[in-house]
């Protein structure tokens, strides 16, 4: 990972597709705590490093939400994995947030943090950093309290299904915005599956709503404990093309390389991308 939440939404899906079946099987060995140690503890979790991917991701999100152009009432985080950092800036702008993941072990990790239970991963360094870059005078405790209050549900998801959240109607749809960090490329065996997964999640978004994607560039594998998980390597232009095909306008696309000192042997990621896209109206 590159700070990459790829545990997120590994679908079991269609049994007739051996590639997707292999992805689902591999993710049964996913270890959330190993993943968090690899990517959110130092050195990658050292947010004081100016060229680190952690500060870059948080800055992209904070600057996007600071524009006021990405807002509404409902937001769905697609494939949350065991992480919450991707919502620290979003929670000031959306009062109803749904977190999702394919794996129960990741959903349990999220519940530990939301309930402030013993043994929960400590995200306070990330919360402090977001408060610093937002510059609103908010304490990190207030930031975390707001996020906990605004996450209304944690649901199973399978991005390889045409209805990723199923037909139960447990989340208010369509959502005003979607966030997805290090999910689609990590659970898709090839670019065609990546495109279909993007098409599927976009059905959850209202026309005119925004989709924020963070992901890994040119990565083929990463480690999460005993699990060595395959990733479909994507380039920035392929992400752009996929967004165009799924009837969204890609307004912002940025990238940053993975610094050499953060190439720690837990993946082969080359860089990180951030995109902001808007679903077209009337298509």
Swiss-Prot record:
Pathway: Catecholamine biosynthesis; (R)-adrenaline biosynthesis; (R)-adrenaline from (R)-noradrenaline: step 1/1. It catalyses: phenylethanolamine + S-adenosyl-L-methionine = N-methylphenylethanolamine + S-adenosyl-L-homocysteine + H(+); (R)-noradrenaline + S-adenosyl-L-methionine = (R)-adrenaline + S-adenosyl-L-homocysteine + H(+); (R)-normetanephrine + S-adenosyl-L-methionine = (R)-metanephrine + S-adenosyl-L-homocysteine + H(+); (R)-octopamine + S-adenosyl-L-methionine = (R)-synephrine + S-adenosyl-L-homocysteine + H(+). The keyword Phosphoprotein applies. One of its GO terms (biological process) is epinephrine biosynthetic process. Keywords: Catecholamine biosynthesis, Methyltransferase, Phosphoprotein, S-adenosyl-L-methionine, Transferase. Octopamine binds at residues 219, 267. Optimum pH is 7.9. InterPro entries: NNMT/PNMT/TEMT_CS, NNMT_TEMT_trans, SAM-dep_methyltransferase, SAM-dependent_MTases_sf. S-adenosyl-L-methionine binds at residues 35, 40, 79-80, 85, 101, 106, 158-159, 181. One of its GO terms (molecular function) is phenylethanolamine N-methyltransferase activity. The N-terminus is blocked. PROSITE patterns: NNMT_PNMT_TEMT, SAM_MT_NNMT_PNMT_TEMT. Expressed in the adrenal medulla. Pfam families: NNMT_PNMT_TEMT. Inhibited by p-hydroxymercuribenzoate and p-chloromercuriphenylsulfonate. The modification Phosphoserine is found at residue 7. One of its GO terms (cellular component) is cytosol. Belongs to the class I-like SAM-binding methyltransferase superfamily. NNMT/PNMT/TEMT family. Catalyzes the transmethylation of nonepinephrine (noradrenaline) to form epinephrine (adrenaline), using S-adenosyl-L-methionine as the methyl donor. Other substrates include phenylethanolamine and octopamine. Also methylates normetanephrine. This is Phenylethanolamine N-methyltransferase. It comes from Bos taurus (Bovine).
């Amino acid at each position: 990972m590159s700070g990459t939440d790829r545990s997120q939404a590994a679908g079991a899906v269609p049994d007739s597709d051996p590639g997707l079946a292999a992805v689902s099987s591999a993710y049964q060995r996913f270890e959330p705590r190993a993943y968090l140690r690899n990517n959110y503890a130092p050195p990658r979790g050292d947010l004081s490093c100016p060229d680190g991917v952690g500060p870059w991701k948080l800055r992209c999100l904070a600057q996007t939400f600071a524009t006021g152009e990405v807002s509404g009432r409902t937001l769905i985080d697609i494939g949350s994995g065991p992480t919450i950092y991707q919502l620290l800036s979003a929670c000031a702008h959306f009062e109803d947030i749904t977190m999702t993941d394919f794996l129960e072990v990741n959903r349990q990790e999220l519940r530990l943090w939301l309930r402030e239970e013993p043994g929960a991963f400590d995200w306070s360094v990330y919360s402090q950093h977001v408060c610093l870059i937002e510059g609103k005078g908010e304490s990190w405790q207030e930031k975390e309290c707001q996020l906990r209050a605004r996450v209304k549900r944690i649901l199973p998801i399978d991005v390889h299904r045409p209805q990723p959240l199923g037909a139960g109607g447990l989340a208010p749809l369509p959502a005003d915005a979607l966030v997805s960090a290090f999910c689609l490329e990590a659970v898709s065996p090839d670019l065609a599956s990546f495109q279909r997964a993007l098409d599927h999640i976009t059905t959850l978004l209202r026309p005119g709503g925004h989709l924020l994607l963070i992901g890994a560039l040119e990565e083929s594998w990463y480690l999460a404990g005993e699990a060595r998980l395959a990733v479909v390597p994507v380039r920035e232009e392929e992400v752009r093309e996929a967004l165009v095909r799924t009837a969204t306008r890609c307004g912002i696309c940025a990238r940053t390389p993975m610094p050499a000192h953060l190439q720690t042997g837990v993946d082969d990621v080359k860089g990180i991308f951030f995109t902001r896209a808007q679903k077209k109206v009337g298509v």
